[in-house]
Swiss-Prot record:
Its EC number is 1.7.5.1. [4Fe-4S] cluster binds at residues 50, 54, 58, 93. It comes from Escherichia coli (strain K12). Tetramer composed of an alpha, a beta and 2 gamma chains. Alpha and beta are catalytic chains; gamma chain is involved in binding the enzyme complex to the cytoplasmic membrane. Its cofactor is [4Fe-4S] cluster; Mo-bis(molybdopterin guanine dinucleotide). Binds 1 [4Fe-4S] cluster per subunit. Binds 1 molybdenum-bis(molybdopterin guanine dinucleotide) (Mo-bis-MGD) cofactor per subunit. Mo-bis(molybdopterin guanine dinucleotide) binds at residue 223. It is a peripheral membrane protein. This is Respiratory nitrate reductase 2 alpha chain. Its main location: membrane. It is found in: Cell membrane. PANTHER family: RESPIRATORY NITRATE REDUCTASE (PTHR43105), RESPIRATORY NITRATE REDUCTASE 2 ALPHA CHAIN (PTHR43105:SF2). One of its GO terms (cellular component) is nitrate reductase complex. The gene is narZ.
């Protein structure tokens, strides 16, 4: 029947009505509804998440139709919270909601790709050599062939290949490199395993079976806050976001919660309905400032000054004038403030704080015979010297006393915070002051660089009969903050209005924040903590941690929290959120990831030192150690270049090294056999005699640099790679935009410990292999690009510090085109390696140098002074004064069999983490039944790890966080050390065993584990330090308590034994730049900041069409209206940003939210989107890291000293970048460098 007439308004009858005429029956055509129904039809829904470093860890419904992913929406079935707490869902953000666009976009990598010039060389070599290893050798031994493909990296030229061909090439390159130079010349970089832990483990397991180098990430990203290890002996442990709701006062300090913590921001707003006050502290008017009750805008880089001014108020009002019993008792028990510190005399009659008194300093060691040099001393309220339980000396070599019970020598005791009232004299003690250092871009307040303040002291007779004055840390802290104690101290402040360090008036001068605001907020923060017993919280972010002196910023805030008894209390404490660092089932994951089931120890390296060295950034270093030293230090003992300090640290075992030795470690066994020595003895003797050198001492030797590099789950050259242009030149051997001069040309400070060569090696990497699902900046510079499965096409697991759940990535559809999951890719490479290595590598003995690790007895190395064996100051003792030297047996032809099975070391040595261990036989037996076992071959009878799900089951079975039986064993193991019963924390979950299919059904809350410092409970939200405070488990520090005083000799020499305001450093990136020709527009030097962006998670999503549409469609730089007027820049103009490190081009965003003197380029905007050429370099503009360069800090190199000991991603040099300054100007000519003859150069109008 025709419906033609129905389409006309007037040629139809009125339809039947109903509901008293309010409704009408219609007979119109409804065929249009079918298209709507078809659009939203689906065949299935699969749970997955996004393996991106955002900390969100959000569970999503993935809709599949006809074998294709059509869209995604948020899951809403998280386990419910207790009645007084909001639920977690829905969790998600616009970036995550756009991810399905990637799967079928033009950006998707579909096939294995290789650089055309390289594959032509490879195919030609295979025609001449039937052995792939010899074929690769023929290319490597011809400099012209190497140069031919290295110099065109980053300039296109990829062609499609196949998996078999490329696996063979990669394996041959690895075999030749290992055979010729050593396995530590093969390295891999991948970040943040928590976001897809099996994918991470795939690459590091392969590398570890080879003996390759696994590079760290948390320190390199500058997500690692060194202040956390310094204070707590913990990498980072923080409250889950739900605990914000338990807080009564929150300061969001440099953390842009709604923008970078979108899924969690609802807790931040919901808690305000309870009356919680929220404060934003950011230099720019950011998203978080709009959410808060009050906004403070300190000058960027002056956060420690503001924190110390607030600390001054807290100490004066709540510790001295009107002491809070809660604060005093908390500090007495849970901080190092009662501990005694030696005073060392100065020539002028004053003293300088030295190291902490140890039991070994006193007669008979105060009755302590086990590690007395590592046990700190205090005075109790009766005036007696005591050795309180809990210091690091109780942790190793004895059991039952490593706890925070108020006991010393088996007797109840109460420690004294201050010596005032028990003192023998009052002495002048000198403190360094850095706030007077002049910098044209930052405010300073002139004072004597040495401030002498009066302290109460007690005189002790030491074991050698000498008398030594001592002070308590508490008295040192009060003096350091400039508080008047009634001791006739002219340098202390009598009231807040005095402009003396570190009063509110002084803070106003430095930060620009009015002192009345400093006083009010500090008072409110402390008063709330006093009334609620610690429910005041500080949420911190990358904005504060990315400065060179980030540890001073953080220690200032941490001190506020400790003064107020907030750490370890629900709703209180330190909440640092930068990076999805919390891999909750960590101890179950470690054996899988680093092949600890087959070989121990693995080779691990801190990336900051690695890239600083091997991208030759040290050759351009203009910052000297001398300018960083305290005015109280003996400068003659701390001479040299910054890389010298890194080399000394590696030599003494403080830091790892890669490559490690100046020759192939696989050849040492043969030399040792000839000498009749073990490999360990031979290596130690050869190092001591100088016959064998460490590779770090000769970085430009042809055999002492990395040659093969794997990058996966990362955009190293488009996101985290500080010193981008240096990487291009020295690692890759391609064109770069460096505008500075090497030290050789500029007559700068040359290294003392490192051999200087006039010509540095360019193009150190023979092979760069990148795994990704999209064409990223790193892919553009790679030799081989392998297409990985997306997060909706593979099985994996994901956890975060923001919530207590573990949930999966699931293969909703098969990997598209020829992509494969990371596990399958590395399994394929391992199989090719096992085939190719035959005849070249067999069963080999590898000599591995292992640094003095935190959470091991090696953290008790040199207790009182720093002695260097190379200088003859002590003997070379592996594991004590030098790295531990370990001979590791490798079976290279069995690499594939070992990769796909769980090795026997788990049965023999068990498992553990953070200094405790337990038996795992039950779990190994279970995995053999669950995953089945190898039927034959070198791994016969071992549990299979064939698939990613098998790997997930290994993690879940071995981890106390996901296996209640293991959790009980872990708590028992800890209880043997502490002498306390802790199993009650997990007994009720003993029968709970989480499997992969369980988390696919619903996210599961993990089980409380002793390797973390909070509890997973239905009664309390996860809060870091909770078990330390409530279970009396010591912090893993020298004193066993929260460590405010850092007494290592290097910390004291660099003026950082106590917190101090240190202004941003002068990197000289502008002043030491080559002469850049003017372009007719004005130029200005501005501070260059790189906060996290709104339209991407790092570089992911930054080239996603949906996000580009919502943003400006390409790279942008924010500047203030004031600076823009001065530079004749208007909004959306093309500008160029440049300094000695390189140049970048972007559009300007002119905004009143940005203060004058700074510019912001949101971090990791991909260089592949809408970037014209640079007028400075003549090349296409760079990325945000084109104008940065790494500058390591010596105090981050300390090791073998309790909490100041290296651990993978735990402590070490960090890649800061916010002290950089750049020149900015409007571009005159915008040239797109299309080279097609049709492009027009756009000329700007003046």
């Amino acid at each position: 029947m025709s419906k033609l007439l129905d389409r006309f308004r007037y040629f139809k009858q009125k339809g039947e009505t109903f509901a008293d005429g309010h409704g009408q029956v219609m007979h119109s055509n409804r065929d249009w509804e079918d298209s709507y129904r078809q659009r939203w039809q689906f065949d299935k829904i699969v749970r997955s998440t996004h393996g991106v470093n955002c900390t969100g860890s959000c569970s999503w419904k993935i809709y599949v139709k006809n074998g294709l992913v059509t869209w995604e929406i948020q899951q809403t079935d998280y386990p419910r919270t207790r009645p007084d707490l909001p639920n977690h869902e829905p969790r998600g953000c616009p970036r995550g909601a756009s991810y399905s666009w990637y799967l079928y976009s033009a950006n998707r990598l579909k096939y294995p790709l290789i650089r055309k010039r390289l594959i032509e060389l490879w195919r030609e070599a295979l025609k001449q050599h039937s052995d792939p290893v010899l074929a690769w050798a023929s290319i490597m031994n011809d400099p012209q062939k190497c140069l031919s493909y290295k110099q065109v990296r980053g300039r296109g030229g990829f062609i499609r290949s196949n998996w078999q061909e490329l696996n063979q090439l990669i394996a041959a390159a690895n075999v030749w490199t290992i055979k010729t130079y050593g396995p530590d010349r093969v390295a891999g970089f991948s970040p943040i395993p928590a976001m897809s832990m099996v994918s991470y483990a795939a690459g590091t397991r392969y590398l570890s079976l080879l003996g390759g180098t696994c590079l760290s990430f948390y320190d390199w990203y500058c997500d690692l806050p060194p202040a956390s290890p310094m204070t707590w002996g913990e990498q980072t442990d923080v409250p889950e976001s739900a605990d914000w709701y338990n807080s009564s006062y929150i300061i969001a300090w440099g953390s842009n919660v709604p923008q970078t913590r979108t899924p969690d921001a609802h807790f931040f707003t919901e808690v305000r309905y309870k009356g919680t006050k929220t404060i934003a502290i950011t230099p720019d008017y950011s998203e978080v400032a709009k959410l808060c009750d009050q906004w403070l805008a300190p000058k960027q880089g002056t956060d420690s000054a503001l924190a110390m001014a607030m600390g001054h108020v807290i100490l004066k009002e709540f510790h001295l004038d009107n002491p809070s019993d809660y604060f005093i008792n908390y500090c007495r028990r849970y901080s190092d403030m009662p501990m005694l510190v030696m005073l060392e005399p100065r020539d002028d009659g004053s003293y300088v704080p030295g190291r902490m008194i140890r039991a070994s300093d006193l007669v008979d060691g105060l009755g302590e015979s086990n590690n007395p040099q590592w046990k700190t001393v205090a005075v109790n309220t009766a005036g007696e010297l005591v050795v309180p339980n809990g210091s690091i000396g109780f942790r190793w070599g004895e059991k039952g006393k490593w706890n925070l019970e108020s006991i010393a020598a088996g007797t109840e005791t109460e420690l004294s915070l201050t010596l005032l009232g028990q003192h023998d004299a009052v002495a002048g003690v000198a403190f360094p002051y850095f706030g007077g250092i002049e910098n044209p871009h930052f405010r300073s307040v002139k004072h004597n660089p040495v401030l002498v303040r009066q302290l109460p002291v007690k005189n002790l007779t030491l074991v050698d009969g000498n008398t030594c004055p001592v002070v308590s840390v508490y008295d040192l802290v009060l003096a350091n903050y400039g508080l008047d104690r009634g001791l006739e101290d002219e340098n202390s402040a009598k009231d807040y209005a005095e402009i003396k360090p570190y009063t509110p008036a002084w803070g106003e001068q430095i930060t620009g924040v009015p002192r009345q605001y400093i006083e009010t907020i500090a008072r409110e923060f402390a008063d709330t903590a006093h009334k609620t017993h610690g429910r005041s919280m500080i949420i911190l972010g990358a904005g504060v941690n990315h400065w060179y002196h980030m540890d001073m910023n953080y220690r200032g805030m941490i001190n506020m929290l400790i003064f107020c008894g907030c750490v370890g209390q629900s709703g209180g404490g330190w909440a640092h959120y930068v990076g999805q660092e919390k891999l909750r089932p960590q101890t179950g994951w470690l054996p899988l990831a680093f092949a600890l089931d087959w070989n121990r120890p693995p080779r691990q390296m801190n990336s900051t030192s690695f890239f600083y060295n091997h991208s030759s950034q040290w050759r351009y270093e203009k910052v000297s150690a001398q300018e960083l030293l305290s005015p109280l230090a003996d400068a003659s003992k701390y001479s040299g270049h910054l890389i010298d300090f890194n080399v000394r640290a590696e030599r003494m075992g403080w830091l790892p090294s890669a490559p490690q030795l100046g020759r192939n470690p696989l050849g040492i066994k043969a030399e040792a056999d000839k000498a009749g020595l073990s490999p360990t003895e031979f290596t130690a003797q050869a190092l001591k005699s100088g016959d064998l050198r460490m590779a770090c001492e000769q970085p430009d030797s042809s055999s002492n640099h990395p040659r093969n590099l794997f990058v996966w789950r990362s955009n190293l050259l488009g996101s985290s790679g500080k010193g981008h242009e240096y990487m291009q030149k020295y690692l890759l051997g391609t064109e770069s935009g460096i505008q500075g001069e090497e030290l050789g040309a500029s007559d700068g400070i040359k290294p003392e410990e490192v051999e200087w060569q006039t010509a540095a090696i360019e193009g150190k990497l023979d092979l760069l292999v990148t795994l990704d699902f999209r064409m990223s900046s790193t892919c553009l510079f790679s030799d081989i690009v392998l297409p990985t499965a997306t997060w909706y096409e593979k099985d994996d697991m994901n956890t975060s510090d923001m919530h207590p759940f573990i949930h999966p990535l699931s293969a909703a559809v098969d990997p598209a085109w020829e992509s494969r999951s990371d596990w399958e890719i590395y399994k394929g490479i391992a199989k090719a390696f096992s085939q190719v290595c035959v005849g070249h590598l067999g069963k080999e003995t590898d000599v591995v140098l292992q640094p003095l690790l935190h959470d091991s007895p090696a953290e008790l190395s040199q207790p009182c002074e720093v002695l260097d064996w190379r200088k003859g100051e002590c003997d070379l003792i592996p594991g004590k004064t030098a790295p531990n030297i370990v001979a590791v047996e490798r079976d290279y032809p069995a690499t594939y069999e070992r990769f796909t099975s769980l090795g026997p070391l788990m049965d023999k040595l068990g498992n553990g983490g953070k200094g405790i261990s337990w038996n795992t036989q039950d779990e190994i037996d279970f995995l053999g039944k669950l995953n089945y076992t190898k039927r034959d071959g070198p791994a016969q009878g071992r549990p299979l790890i064939d698939t990613a799900i098998d790997a997930s089951e290994v993690i879940l079975a071995l981890a106390p966080e996901t296996n209640g039986h293991v959790a009980v064993k872990a708590w028992q193991a800890l209880g043997e050390i502490t002498g306390r019963e802790h199993t009650h924390l997990a007994l009720h979950k003993e029968d709970e065993k989480i499997r992969f299919r369980d988390i696919q059904a619903q996210p599961r809350k993990i089980i409380s584990s002793p390797t973390w410092s909070g509890l997973e409970s239905d009664h309390v939200s996860y809060n870091a330090g909770y078990t330390n405070v409530h279970e009396l488990i010591p912090w893993r520090t020298l004193s066993g308590r929260q460590q405010l005083y850092q007494d290592h000799p290097w910390m004291r020499a660099f003026g950082e034994s106590l917190v101090a305001y240190r202004p941003p450093i002068d990197t000289r990136s502008v002043s030491e730049m080559r002469q850049i020709p003017p372009n007719g527009f004005p130029e200005k030097a501005l501070n260059f900041l790189t906060p996290h962006q709104k339209w991407g998670i790092h570089s992911t999503y930054s080239e996603n069409l949906l996000m580009l549409t919502l943003s400006r469609g390409g790279p942008i730089v924010w500047i203030s209206e004031t600076d823009a007027r001065e530079l004749t820049i208007v909004d959306n103009d093309w500008v160029e940003v440049f300094n000695a490190n390189g140049a970048l081009t972007a559009r300007a965003v002119v905004s009143q939210r940005v203060p004058p003197g700074m510019t912001m380029m949101y971090h990791a905007q991909e260089r592949i989107m809408n970037i014209p050429g640079s007028e400075v370099t003549g090349m296409r503009g760079g990325i945000h890291n084109s104008v940065t360069r790494v500058c390591p800090k010596p105090t981050h190199m300390i090791g073998g000293y309790a909490q100041l000991a290296w651990g993978f991603n735990y402590y070490g040099t960090v890649g800061s970048n916010r002290d950089e300054f750049i020149m900015i100007r409007k571009m005159k000519n915008v040239n797109w460098l299309d080279d097609e003859g049709r492009d027009q150069v756009q000329e700007a109008k003046k």
